[in-house]
């Protein structure tokens, strides 16, 4: 895929990308009290589930590893590209101009 094709795809799916980001931002995923099936608490388990749900909707095969982490993959073959990230947050605190759990767009 050429760079221009990638840029066009991003431009064409901007609203979908922002909608999916909004779904994730809305979840308070700060570290919580571990519970059955939720090793990092309820919030991180919820955001992991939501992220994997979004990946499913986008056509990826997803795997949840006991709510410790998960991954999404597409295609077959021996060569892979891996991108690591995290979905948990630090406590939101009270010094926000906007609601920290609501995606805000300016401009």
Sequence positions of predicted segments:
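N-terminal capping segment at the start of a domain
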Residues: 3-42
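Short charge-dense sequence patches
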Residues: 1-8, 75-83
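Short hydrophobic/aromatic-rich motifs at helix boundaries and adjacent loops
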Residues: 20-25, 73-74, 100-101
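Active-site metal-coordination/substrate-binding segment of hydrolases
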Residues: 80-107
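Hydrophobic aliphatic residue packing
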Residues: 10, 25, 47, 89-90
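Short, well-ordered helical secondary-structure segments
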Residues: 8, 12-14, 59, 74, ...
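A non-catalytic alpha/beta surface segment that caps or lines the substrate-entry region
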Residues: 34-79, 102-103
């Amino acid at each position: 895929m050429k760079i221009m094709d990638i840029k066009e795809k991003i431009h064409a799916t901007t609203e979908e990308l922002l909608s999916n980001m909004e779904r994730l931002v809305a979840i308070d995923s700060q570290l919580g009290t571990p519970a059955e099936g939720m090793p990092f608490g309820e919030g991180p388990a919820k955001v992991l589930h939501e992220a994997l749900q979004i990946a499913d909707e986008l056509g990826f095969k997803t795997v949840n590893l006991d709510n410790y982490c998960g991954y999404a993959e597409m295609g077959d073959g021996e060569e892979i590209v891996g991108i690591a990230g995290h979905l948990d947050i630090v406590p939101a605190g009270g010094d926000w101009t906007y609601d920290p759990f609501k995606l805000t767009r300016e401009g």
